[in-house]
Design a protein with these regions (language model features):
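Rossmann-fold NAD(P)-binding glycine/threonine-rich loop
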Residues: 78-81, 85-136
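Short beta->alpha connector loops
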Residues: 61-64, 126-128, 150-152
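Internal alpha-helical scaffold of NAD(P)-dependent oxidoreductase catalytic cores
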Residues: 113-120, 138-177, 181-186
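Short amphipathic alpha-helical segments
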Residues: 6, 68-72, 94-95, 134, ...
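NAD(P)+-binding Rossmann beta1-loop-alpha1 motif at the extreme N-terminus of oxidoreductases
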Residues: 1-34
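Rossmann-like NAD(P)-binding element
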Residues: 36-81, 87-94
């Protein structure tokens, strides 16, 4: 199924990125206004997304995850599916970034510990946005690796990924997020 970015937002209403200091979304305003008018989508603070969303894409820089979740209100993530698109990368010394996760302490695991009542699924963190919702490659259908502790949450993420056009391989529990995160260094 070919899905445009607008169709993706219309179907899954999600979000987004932030300007870390102001708890506001930071996307192309023209796109957001058009999306809002055409699809009745809405924008808001991290807190509003956490309260409203049932499936939330967490797309911050790795070092901004804790602030984004804390600003949102940890309690608002209870029973929500959190698709963790983050990577544990430190860009403070420039490029290439430093990989900061260790076995047993991946960013996915840290997020799950921070919001224990949420259902965190690591996915989409090793691909570029231009193929995220339309992964058509000459070589064939690509495989998306996922990991998480809740089987229903992983089914939700699998459905989203398959709607986009991905084959999905479930690596197991959230402790496997380290293996997926480590692949980000190959992509960068």
């Amino acid at each position: 199924m070919d899905l445009s970015l607008t169709e993706f937002f219309e179907k899954w209403v999600i979000i987004i990125r932030s300007d870390n200091n102001k708890n506001k979304f930071n996307l192309n305003q023209t796109f957001l206004i058009r999306l809002r008018i055409q699809n009745n989508a809405s924008i808001g603070t991290f807190s509003e997304v956490a309260e409203f969303g049932e499936v939330i894409f967490l797309c911050t820089l790795g070092n901004a995850v804790q602030d984004a979740i804390t600003l949102s209100g940890i309690e608002k993530f209870s029973n929500k599916v959190i698709i963790d698109v983050t990577n544990p990368l430190d860009f403070s010394q420039g490029l290439p970034p430093k990989f900061t996760a260790t076995i047993g302490n991946s960013l996915g695991e840290e997020i799950q510990r921070l919001i224990p009542e949420a259902h965190v699924v690591k996915a989409f963190n090793t691909i570029s946005v231009n193929i995220m919702v339309n992964p058509k490659l000459e070589e064939g259908t690509p495989t998306l690796l996922i990991s998480g502790n809740n089987s229903d949450a992983k089914k939700t993420v699998t459905t989203i990924a398959e709607d986009f056009g991905w084959e999905v391989e479930d690596l197991g529990g959230i402790e496997q997020a380290f293996l997926i995160e480590a692949q980000a260094m190959l992509w960068i």
